[in-house]
């Protein structure tokens, strides 16, 4: 129907947010600590596919928009659009469940996320929010930034990403 204005909104959420930087990895028995910002970094890297269309290209060609976001407790991948619901859902499931991390693409992402951190540091509202949060949650995992610090980001490797992915996804 030409007058149908239905817009589909589909999400894929995993319970891996920024507060989960200490955990027992899958098939291991000892607690491990990873740098802050890993969940957000992983969110960025899941958008990179080994071959074929990248998510932004695929969804754009089908008339949909895609995005992702990380919170303290979750990471969500999503798309919205009026057409091709089945194909879009299948693609969302495929790209989120087929990670592709290399030392090269992890290193290049560090620069992108570092720029994101600097943008937040240049925004007075973000700076105030970070200050209030750090002081309000002094002894709580919510005190740490979702995106991490530049020091945290520089410690992230493809092995850390795969370990977190395999544990939480």
Which residues are covered by each model-predicted region?
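His/Glu-rich zincin catalytic helix
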Residues: 1-54, 165-169
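Charge-rich, well-structured scaffold segments of protease-associated domains
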Residues: 45, 49-169
């Amino acid at each position: 129907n030409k007058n149908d204005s239905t817009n589909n909104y589909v999400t894929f959420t995993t319970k891996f947010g920024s507060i989960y930087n200490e955990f027992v990895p899958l098939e291991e028995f000892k607690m491990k600590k990873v740098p802050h910002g890993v969940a957000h970094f992983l969110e960025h890297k899941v958008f990179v596919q080994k071959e074929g269309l990248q998510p932004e290209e695929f969804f754009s060609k089908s008339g949909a928009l895609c995005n992702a976001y990380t919170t303290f407790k979750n990471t969500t991948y999503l798309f919205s659009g009026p057409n091709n619901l089945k194909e879009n859902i299948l693609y969302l499931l495929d790209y989120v469940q087929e990670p592709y991390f290399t030392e090269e693409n992890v290193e290049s992402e560090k620069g992108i996320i570092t720029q994101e951190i600097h943008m937040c540091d240049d925004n007075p509202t973000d700076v105030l929010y970070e200050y209030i949060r750090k002081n309000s949650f002094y002894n709580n995992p919510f005190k740490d930034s979702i995106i991490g610090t530049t020091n945290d980001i520089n410690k992230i490797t493809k092995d850390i990403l795969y370990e977190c992915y395999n544990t939480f996804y």
